[in-house]
Each structure stands twice: as C-alpha cells, then as structure tokens.
C-alpha cells in the first residue's frame, strides 16, 4: 500500500485514500512535487488544493503551481514575473509592428481604406487550426515569379485587392484542378 501512495501523502507520511484528491495531480513518481514543496511548502499546496471544489480546478492549480515553482527555481528573484514581462514586451513589439504596417499601407491606399483588425473576416478557431495558415503559406510558396511580383504590387485602392488575390489564387487553383489535385495537394477525383 505504501508504494501506491501519491507524492503528497508520501511527503506528509499519510495513508493515501482510494479517492485521494492529490493522487491525480501528483502521482507517486512525480519528481516535480519536490520542487513545488521546496518553493511553496506541502501544507500550503494542500490548503490550495483543498479549497478548490472541482477536479478541473485542482488540475489547473497543480499545473500553475508546477509552472510557478519551476520558474522560481530558474529565476529565484523574479520567477514568473520576468517571463510575463518578456511576453508583454513581445506583444508590445508586435502591436507596434502592426501599427507601423497599417500606417505604411495607409500611405499607399489611404487611411480610410485600411481595414481595421476587427473588420477582417477570421474564423474563431483560426489560431487553433494550423491548416488555415499552412494552406495559405503553401499557396504563396507555389507561386511562380510573375505571380509573386503581381502579389507584391500594392493595389491603388482597397477594392482592387480582392480582384488581384482572386486573379492570382484563382488561376492557380484552376491549374491545380485540371491535373486532378487541389491547391493543397489532395486529389479531387474522390477515388475514381
């Protein structure tokens, strides 16, 4: 029975009940729990997990404690805070790049013609599905030099942009459909 105890019960030298709330999050072979109790203390970890009502909340808390403890070991002075500052800095740089690109595009097509980020059609799961971005990148990579040059020419008005994109990508898809394959390389023959 002693070998089946979870990491928390081993540290606290208690018997591990069959429905122990710590066992799913800190199994007996979990080496990260030693780091967690080194930083937060076993009693504090138990109090945090005991005060949570649902197993999903305990799982999130256990992962957060694990992440924060590892960050504190790597950087004893600032821990997670330093990583948060780094990510905020990256986000600020990206926002500045976007603002710069919008301003530059505005000089070519007019500031009133530049679409706002909330106006752009984008599915809710766009960032979660790599297929949407990968297929677009594959299309761009498969362009010939003439098509790339056409794509790189900025339109004089925002109304011309869809026409240019359709002319480039539409022609490429038509070509790919003639040889029995879509732009992403999949067969259009449906097993015929």
UniProtKB/Swiss-Prot annotation:
Residue ranges of domain LOB in the record: 4-105
Family: Belongs to the LOB domain-containing protein family.
The organism of origin for this protein: Arabidopsis thaliana
Pfam families in the record: LOB (PF03195)
Cited InterPro entries: LOB
PROSITE patterns per the UniProt record, alphabetical: LOB
The name this protein goes by in its record: LOB domain-containing protein 32
